[in-house]
């Protein structure tokens, strides 16, 4: 769930019959932390890092905000770790850097990393920590304010714009991703089994809806906020509801070989990260980053819907994602055993 330029986020349009989207000041500050904390650009490197030194690949966004807070507030240093965060543009770039040893840990979408693991001829990835879970309003199918689509059933045979997949290849006419897999599950429960997908760059989805190139768009926050603000877009379906409620969205991964060599460093990293995740809903040092915000207003940040930051690593919870992928046909050979990736 990646941040759009802060300057594009303006006062949010309020929608009827929806719970309040306002979050605490600390939570808003947590969103802004990814913008205020400097990241090193992705670069070259060789081999694995020395003991106690960890290089983390991340695509700055809402989901990995606690990573930046932990770094800024010295939680990693207190754990005896020297953590460097390198920013990347895509999960595919992260995976390449992870597998080549240029980074030690990579944060990203569960569906992409699970697909990469399932496609590998031998086990290669380990889950270091759980990162981010869905909550109501973080992933939605939206239509324009004057659309005749008002219910999930109205989406049958319509074209839905969705972000281009980063790792999973398009199969048939479906651009599989965690977004489309979750949405298909909710649609099926509503009796809708046939929709058309149109994969587009994330930054083009709102324009496509505005110019009627698609009937609806499937987006996560903060694009939901942007679509509502710019177009008055209306929610038709919450993709993380019912069977997909509280769905795990992203996590932190290392290679199996690195996890075997550096178990203590990974345990210390997970502990420090979970401390930042646990403090995410409490007033605290996160508020200090607001003074250094390069563009997002406090009002806009407080209107972004934020999911949950888990403080434990539960293989059974993460297995829900693998099950969705298998049932939808993304994992065509075998059901991925997530517990084997956690050491549990």
Task: Describe the predicted segments one by one.
Residues 34-38:
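C-terminal motif of bacterial Sec signal peptides marking the signal peptidase cleavage site
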Residues 111, 147, 198-288:
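Pocket-lining segment of extracytoplasmic ligand-binding domains
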Residues 133-134, 241-244, 307-315:
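Short, solvent-exposed loop/beta-turn-alpha elements that line the ligand-binding surface or hinge
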Residues 260-330:
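Secondary-structure end/capping motifs
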Residues 47-199, 215-221, 235-238, 246:
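Short, glycine-/small- and polar/acidic-enriched structural segments
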Residues 325-344:
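Conserved C-terminal helix/tail region of periplasmic/extracytoplasmic solute-binding proteins
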Residues 40-43:
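Bacterial signal peptide processing site
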Residues 3-27:
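Bacterial N-terminal signal peptides that target proteins for export
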């Amino acid at each position: 769930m990646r941040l759009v330029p802060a300057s594009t986020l303006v006062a949010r349009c309020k929608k009827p019959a929806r719970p309040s989207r306002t979050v605490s000041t600390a939570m808003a500050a947590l969103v802004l932390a990814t913008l205020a904390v400097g990241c090193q650009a992705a670069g070259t490197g060789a081999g694995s890092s020395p003991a106690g030194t960890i290089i983390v690949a991340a695509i700055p966004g809402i989901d990995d905000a606690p990573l930046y807070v932990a770094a800024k507030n010295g939680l990693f240093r207190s754990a005896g770790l020297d953590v460097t965060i390198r920013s990347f543009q895509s999960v595919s770039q992260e995976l390449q850097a992870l597998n080549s040893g240029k980074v030690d840990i990579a944060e990203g979408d569960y569906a992409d990393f699970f697909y990469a693991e399932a496609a590998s001829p031998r086990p290669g990835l380990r889950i270091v920590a759980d990162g981010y879970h869905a909550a109501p309003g973080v992933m939605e199918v939206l239509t324009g304010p004057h659309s005749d689509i008002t219910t999930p059933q109205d989406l049958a045979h319509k074209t839905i714009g969705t972000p281009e997949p980063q790792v999973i290849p398009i199969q048939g006419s479906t651009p599989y991703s965690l977004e489309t897999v979750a949405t298909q599950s909710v649609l099926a429960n509503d009796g809708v089994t046939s929709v058309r997908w149109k994969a587009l760059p994330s930054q083009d989805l709102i324009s496509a809806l505005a110019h009627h190139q698609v009937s609806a768009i499937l987006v996560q926050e903060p694009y939901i906020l942007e679509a509502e603000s710019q177009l008055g877009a209306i929610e038709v379906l919450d993709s993380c509801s019912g069977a997909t409620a509280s769905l795990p969205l992203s996590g932190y991964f290392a290679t199996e070989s690195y996890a075997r060599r550096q178990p203590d460093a990974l345990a210390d990293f997970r502990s420090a990260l979970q401390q930042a995740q646990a403090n995410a809903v409490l007033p605290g040092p996160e508020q200090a980053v607001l003074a250094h915000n390069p563009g997002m207003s406090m009002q806009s940040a407080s209107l972004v819907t934020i999911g949950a930051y888990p403080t434990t690593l539960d293989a059974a919870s993460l297995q829900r994602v693998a099950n969705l992928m298998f049932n939808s046909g993304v994992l065509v050979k075998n059901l991925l055993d997530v517990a084997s990736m956690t050491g549990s």
